């Protein structure tokens, strides 16, 4: 599983002009599921997302997690993160999980997140989404589990 984590001042996801998920200060996370990923991988990634220290403390050091600052968590599925881009000029998606598996693992991640944390929003799996964000920093990390 790959998760592109971005610290944001605000973010929202629209589908067909309708806002389907939004947060204020927090983390926007684009999630790509790979064939070997399952429920255990989703649990491990959620632990990282909630505890990864990307927010500044009183001295400006990245010592605070999402749990510490009580920000929002916006999870958005993005199968293109799992693409193989090592050769050629066109990405290969053979390294991405099949759609049914990708949806099941992503939805399990969302379920775990909602059970563990009160401020969770999502995009819509498989939809053509427009993602709007105010990237804070910018601070962006690619997490893998």
From Swiss-Prot:
Residue window of motif Gly-cisPro motif, important for rejection of L-amino acids: 137-138
Gene Ontology, cellular component aspect: cytoplasm
PANTHER family listed in its UniProt record: D-AMINOACYL-TRNA DEACYLASE 1, D-TYROSYL-TRNA TYR DEACYLASE
Any coiled-coil regions, as ranges: none
MF (Gene Ontology): D-tyrosyl-tRNA(Tyr) deacylase activity; Gly-tRNA(Ala) deacylase activity; Ser(Gly)-tRNA(Ala) hydrolase activity; tRNA binding
Native species: Pseudomonas aeruginosa (strain ATCC 15692 / DSM 22644 / CIP 104116 / JCM 14847 / LMG 12228 / 1C / PRS 101 / PAO1)
Assembly: Homodimer.
Domain notes: A Gly-cisPro motif from one monomer fits into the active site of the other monomer to allow specific chiral rejection of L-amino acids.
HAMAP family: Deacylase_Dtd
Family named by the database record: Belongs to the DTD family.
Residues spanning the membrane: none
Function: An aminoacyl-tRNA editing enzyme that deacylates mischarged D-aminoacyl-tRNAs. Also deacylates mischarged glycyl-tRNA(Ala), protecting cells against glycine mischarging by AlaRS. Acts via tRNA-based rather than protein-based catalysis; rejects L-amino acids rather than detecting D-amino acids in the active site. By recycling D-aminoacyl-tRNA to D-amino acids and free tRNA molecules, this enzyme counteracts the toxicity associated with the formation of D-aminoacyl-tRNA entities in vivo and helps enforce protein L-homochirality.
Subcellular location: Cytoplasm
Keywords: Cytoplasm, Hydrolase, RNA-binding, tRNA-binding
Stored CDD domains: Dtyr_deacylase
GO biological process: D-amino acid catabolic process; tRNA metabolic process
Catalytic activity, reaction form: glycyl-tRNA(Ala) + H2O = tRNA(Ala) + glycine + H(+); a D-aminoacyl-tRNA + H2O = a tRNA + a D-alpha-amino acid + H(+)
Chief location bin: cytoplasm
Protein name: D-aminoacyl-tRNA deacylase
Annotated signal peptide: none
Enzyme Commission designation: 3.1.1.96
